[in-house]
Amino acid sequence: MFAADRVVGLTRADWDVTRPAPPLDTPELVLHAAAWTDVDGAEADPQEAAAVNVGGTANVAALGVPLVYFSTDYVFDGSKGEPYVEADAPSPLSAYGRTKLHGEAAAGDRSWIVRSSWLFGPTGHNFVRTMLRLGAERGEVAVVDDQRGCPTYVGHLAEAVLALAELPYGVWHVAAEGDCTWADFAEAIFEEAGIRCRVRRIGSEELQRPARRPAYSVLRSERPGVPRLPHWREGLRHCLERLEAAH
């Protein structure tokens, strides 16, 4: 559907999405990954989070070209107790979740809304890199065991997004196969990386974080044609291989 002869990556220095677009060559397709992702910070500054996640998305949509908008499992409250599908009604618990949900609306009709969850990769700030650092520094880490989701490797998600361009606009749930708690995920990271570090399982209330998180936010798709991602554990192995190759 789209000829990717040229891919242009824009940083915040090129375009702060809270402002209208600067002069650009009109693209065929925009992958809109710019977002406020500080879940707890959004509780303290919901207006700034909305400026990025809602206003910024509206500015990107104003280009008038097809758009891929990356959303989140945090648009759900976790009360369903079984995997969320595209037809389920969102009910976010946090300011972050609300801004991402409003951003879905701001993306407009010519968009693919890609809801994914617990993203991790070899670069940037994410759970895998944090656990690798803490595991190297400590003999024990405390990790919540009462939140369940689908850890999703960004490399697998990127491959799936390319396939979405052949599918109809709308909401798509694209997350790794399988699910686990954060504590399960931490133990898998240490096991795969060969790190001797004990995981102490705790409840969310012990962390006393400003933003509420859904206790169960596993995503599944009921839409035909949705790209199927590998199991989250396979994604973890790919991520660790990339990290090892970079050193």
Residue ranges and their predicted role:
Residues A105-G149, G155-H156:
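NAD(P)-dependent short-chain dehydrogenase/reductase
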Residues G9, A21-V52:
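NAD(P)H-binding glycine-rich loop region in Rossmannoid oxidoreductase-like domains
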Residues A160, E166-A211:
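Mid/C-terminal beta-alpha module of Rossmann-like enzyme folds, strongest
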Residues T181-E187, I202-H247:
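Conserved C-terminal active-site "lid" loop/helix of NAD(P)H-dependent oxidoreductases
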Residues A3-P23:
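Adenosine-cofactor binding site in Rossmann-like domains, unifying the SAM/SAH pocket
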Residues L10, A33-A34, L67-D73, D77, ...:
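SDR active-site strand-loop-helix element
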Residues A44, A51-G56, V75-V114, W118-L119:
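Catalytic helix-loop patch of NAD(P)-dependent Rossmann-fold dehydrogenases
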